[in-house]
Amino acid sequence: DESLFSTSLITERGLKFLEKYKKGDFSEEEKPFALWISFPDPHEPYEAPKRYTDMFPPEEIKLPPQRAGEFNDDTSPERNKILFEIMGHKSESEDQIRSQISVYQAMCKFIDDGIKEIIEKLEELDLKDNTIIVFTSDHGDFMGEHGMFVKGGVFYDCLVKVPLIIAWNNGDFDQGVKEKSVVSTIDIIPTLLHLQGIGDFNDNGLSLIHI
C-alpha cells in the first residue's frame, strides 16, 4: 500500500498543515507559518512503490566507474581504507549493485513527486508567491562509487556535494541563479532572516543572498 510509505505519510501531513493554515485555524501569534518537511528516505530499508521502481529498470542502470586497487596503495588515506573494509561491496554482483541503485533512484523520484505536490498545494492555496522555499539534504550517498554504499565520515563529492535551492517568487534577489560556491547548512537561517529584513545573525553563519 503506497499510502503506508513514510514519503506518502509525510507529504500528506504537509498538505494538511497548509490547508489548515489557509482555513484560518492558526492564531495571529502562529503566523506567518514555518513548515519543515523532512523525508527520512532514501535510507534503509531500500523500498519504493512498484510504479517507481518500474521507472528505473536495473538492467538500464549505468554503474559508476571504479579505480582498481583504489584502497590498496599509499595514495589512499588510512581512514578511507578502513571505511572500505567495513562498507565495501566486495561480495555483491553487478546485478545486485544495479538493483540497489535502481531502488535508490526510485525512492528519490518518490520524494520529488511529494515535493511537487506540496509546491502545487502552495499554488492552489495562493500561498506560493510569498513563501520562501528551501530544499536541501544532509548528505549524499556512495551508491556504488568507490566500491561502497550509504555514507561515511569522508569527504568524497558523492557524500558532501548536495543541493541547496532557495526560491521565493516575491523575493528581492536574482531568480534562477546557479552558484557553485561551497556553503554550509549553518548559512540557511541567516539567509532566511536576511530575506525577511532581519539583520542580526549573531555571527552564526552567513547570508547567501549576495554570493
Go through each PLM region and give its residues.
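Active-site-proximal cap/lid insertion segments
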Residues: 1-10, 19-182, 195-202
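Active-site periphery "cap/insert" segments of enzyme catalytic domains
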Residues: 16
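Zinc-coordinating Cys/His ligand positions in small cysteine/histidine-rich zinc-finger domains
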Residues: 185, 189
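Conserved small/polar residues in nucleotide/adenosyl-binding loops
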Residues: 209-211
